């Protein structure tokens, strides 16, 4: 039985995975997420405050304030356990925490210049509403950065190897490392089922964002988009 993609099921799953979430990201990215996080931070650029959506345990936000020491970050996630780990891990970091749904942010209209979603786009039940909400809270010409685990193009030589890794090795590692085998299966499937770039980029356009930067990593296994509000 697969997990559904409704909010309560996903929230329960991520709460249960919180203690092992960073290890899971290492498995899904073959350890390359550390490099991608650094690249993402640099591509986001300097801002007084980063609004880190789907923040997880705060690794991307911490990378950001490491790169830009005068900045602060607001971490938003619907998993209280994820935020609890971030609070415990970075007690002295200039972080503010909001437990909530990014499709209904308790944030004023046009109040932020920079937002980011890392490894969370594929888990959003309603990407259209989430993008519209982010557009609402960004100032004119504000930016949204997205870092996501994606797939090589269908005709790429690494496409088959990537599919086999997600289909067989990730669930196997999940069985060995965790009691929550179903969650590992879901996370692998979420990468496979993420729509292609053309579809996602039309969503961005429909939500009144334009692409200012885009970069692929590891033959397309990860993608960064920097979007500007229009």
UniProtKB/Swiss-Prot annotation:
GO molecular function: demethylmenaquinone methyltransferase activity
EC identifiers of the protein: 2.1.1.163
Reactions catalysed: a 2-demethylmenaquinol + S-adenosyl-L-methionine = a menaquinol + S-adenosyl-L-homocysteine + H(+)
InterPro entries linked to this entry: SAM-dependent_MTases_sf, UbiE/COQ5_MeTrFase, UbiE/COQ5_MeTrFase_CS
Entry-linked Gene3D superfamilies: Vaccinia Virus protein VP39
Annotated metabolic or biological route of this protein: Quinol/quinone metabolism; menaquinone biosynthesis; menaquinol from 1,4-dihydroxy-2-naphthoate: step 2/2
Keyword line: Menaquinone biosynthesis, Methyltransferase, S-adenosyl-L-methionine, Transferase
Keyword flag Transmembrane: no
Ligand binding (S-adenosyl-L-methionine): 57, 77, 101-102, 118
GO biological process: menaquinone biosynthetic process; methylation
PROSITE patterns from the UniProt entry: SAM_MT_UBIE, UBIE_1
Keyword match Ribosomal protein: no
Entry-linked NCBIfam families: MenG_MenH_UbiE, PRK00216.1-5
Entry similarity comment: Belongs to the class I-like SAM-binding methyltransferase superfamily. MenG/UbiE family.
HAMAP family: MenG_UbiE_methyltr
Function in brief: Methyltransferase required for the conversion of demethylmenaquinol (DMKH2) to menaquinol (MKH2).
Name the record gives this protein: Demethylmenaquinone methyltransferase
Organism of origin: Chlamydia caviae (strain ATCC VR-813 / DSM 19441 / 03DC25 / GPIC) (Chlamydophila caviae)
Gene label: menG
């Amino acid at each position: 039985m697969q997990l559904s993609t409704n909010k309560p099921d996903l929230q329960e799953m991520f709460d249960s995975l919180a203690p092992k979430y960073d290890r899971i990201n290492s498995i899904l990215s073959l350890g390359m997420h550390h490099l991608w996080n650094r690249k993402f931070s640099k591509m986001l650029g300097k801002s007084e405050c980063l609004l880190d959506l789907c923040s997880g345990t705060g690794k991307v936000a911490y990378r950001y304030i490491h790169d830009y020491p005068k900045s602060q970050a607001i971490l938003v996630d619907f998993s209280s356990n994820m935020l609890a780990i971030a609070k415990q891990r970075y007690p002295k970091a200039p972080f503010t925490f909001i437990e909530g749904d990014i499709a209904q942010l308790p944030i004023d209209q046009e109040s932020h210049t920079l937002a980011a979603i890392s490894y969370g786009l594929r888990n959003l039940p309603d990407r259209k509403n989430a993008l519209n909400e982010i557009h609402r809270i960004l100032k004119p010409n504000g930016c949204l950065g997205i870092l996501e685990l994606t797939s090589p193009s269908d005709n790429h030589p690494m496409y088959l190897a990537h599919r086999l890794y997600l289909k067989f090795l990730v669930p196997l590692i999940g069985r060995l490392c965790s009691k929550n085998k179903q969650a590992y299966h879901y996370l692998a499937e979420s990468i496979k089922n993420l729509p292609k770039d053309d579809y996602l980029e039309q969503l961005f356009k429909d939500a009144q964002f334009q692409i200012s930067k885009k970069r692929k990593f590891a033959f397309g296994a990860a993608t960064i988009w920097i979007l500007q509000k229009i």
